[in-house]
């Protein structure tokens, strides 16, 4: 599948009612062929929500915990093992997750929250970087499911799912580089992060 023909599904969800969120996330995934189209039984799958910082869901900074829960349940129903992780800007992933409600989801479902321990990986064809320091867990899982929070950003206007992958690079390093280098940097730098 090429990037030019990647399908997208959009489903409206009027409230953060737990049953409704699950139903709508499942509907969106089913429009793309179902979770079994993305993960296979026995695979290890990292859910990558936006855990920028430990803010409660009503502050709209991080991915809503009920969305993470719905995706986790769908991945499990497809027979895969689920992990949750990110590289928050200031605190550990576990601390941020518990502050924003994702930690409770992980506890309730028996899912491990993993920290992004740094490892350097090559990127020989990169325009901006010839290597990246990313979370080691990204090299150890079979799949990564990006679960961003829809919001705006000063360097990319509307980030959609792209900016959430910048957290795959070590959080504090990524946050220092972005404002200093500007929009062209963001556009050329984010693409190669999807390779890992």
Positions of the model-derived regions?
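N-terminal and secondary-structure boundary signal
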Residues: 1-196
